[in-house]
């Protein structure tokens, strides 16, 4: 199953897989089901005076064929959540998981095949060469999660076909701690956010900007929390 596949790829604990991979996808699916009818509804917009007597509205239509390229650090979450969004908008999808998670990719191949016809959703396993070949094809939209370096290559490939792109390229996440902070609670939450998934999270806190008067206490509490957990 998924827990075993992810553990085989990089040792992730089953409980952590539940918390960071499965539950977020269930929440995304439920949120989409609850709001999709409202999202699909056409929106009235203003009409230019030159077109007086007419009615204007925005209608939401599928892009067409979507390519989703997912990373290794959250191989289920960061593949399925974009898939939920793309399919709920009426698109067909091609999926390419990271080559660094072969066991998870194999699980996903079986999982996706059991749910969808290949004409609706198809998943390709394999090396980065497969991704490069896919990027040569005329997709209507490309969703990529990964590094800025590869993101530039994805954007350049998309430009050849005037495809739109969604690029999630990570970033820096500072924590700002002032003199009013509850240091015990702050340290506990920051250590959880920093070390979940062994720190391999795009929004994990990278550094803290802390009031000088709270620095010693913060370091003490952080060390104690890490020692108790690891």
Q: Which residues fall in each region the model found?
A:
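Short beta->alpha connector loops at strand-helix junctions that form conserved
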Residues: 91, 96-98, 125, 145-146, ...
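A structured beta-alpha segment of the ubiquitous adenosine-cofactor-binding alpha/beta core
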Residues: 55-57, 123-140
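ALDH superfamily catalytic-core signature
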Residues: 116, 149-230
């Amino acid at each position: 199953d998924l827990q075993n596949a992810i553990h085989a790829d990089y040792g992730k604990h089953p409980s952590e897989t539940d918390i960071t991979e499965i539950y977020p996808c269930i929440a995304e699916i439920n949120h989409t089901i609850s709001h999709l009818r409202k999202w699909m509804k056409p929106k009235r917009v203003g009409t230019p005076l030159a077109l007086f007597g007419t009615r204007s509205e925005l209608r939401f239509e599928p892009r067409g064929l979507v390519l989703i390229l997912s990373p290794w650090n959250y191989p289920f979450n960061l593949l399925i959540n974009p898939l939920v969004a793309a399919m709920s908008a009426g698109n067909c999808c091609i999926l390419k998981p990271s080559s660094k998670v072969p066991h998870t990719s194999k699980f996903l191949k079986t999982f996706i095949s059991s749910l969808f016809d290949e004409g609706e959703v198809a998943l390709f396993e394999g090396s980065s060469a497969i991704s490069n070949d896919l990027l040569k094809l005329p997709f209507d939209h490309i969703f990529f999660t990964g590094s800025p370096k590869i993101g530039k290559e994805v954007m350049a490939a998309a430009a050849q076909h005037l495809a739109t792109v969604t690029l999630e390229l990570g970033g820096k996440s500072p924590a700002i701690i002032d003199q009013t902070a509850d240091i015990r609670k702050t340290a506990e939450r920051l250590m959880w956010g920093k070390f979940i998934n062994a720190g391999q999270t795009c929004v994990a806190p990278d550094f803290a900007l802390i009031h000088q008067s709270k620095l010693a206490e913060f370091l003490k509490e952080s060390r104690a929390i890490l020692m108790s957990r690891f």
